[in-house]
Amino acid sequence: MKADYNTYYYIAASKHFLTQEEPLEEILREKTEHFIANNKSIDFWIFDSTKLNAHSPNEIKTLQKTFFFPTILIISSNKKFITWLKLRLRYIFTDKIQLAIKL
């Protein structure tokens, strides 16, 4: 039986950059408030490479291993949101990933 894959878009950057040099917490808090105020479901997930465990998706663990430093990934099914984050944060990596699970 062939697995169904879901396409997600993501940004990746060093944990230090996103938590110390950029106001990531503030950006995501404002975006979350916007989603709630507009009755939209929150469709992004944050993965910290230093906190992955046995329950983390294998594709995410494999992706995190491609970076040589503690990394944060923000994953969403909404490509426009990821593009907005890229424009807002600038010095980050973006791409897409196919996951066999639905986040």
Swiss-Prot record:
It is found in: Plastid, Chloroplast. InterPro entries: Ycf54, Ycf54-like_sf. Keywords: Chloroplast, Plastid. The keyword Secreted does not apply. Its main location: plastid. Belongs to the ycf54 family. This is Uncharacterized protein ycf54.
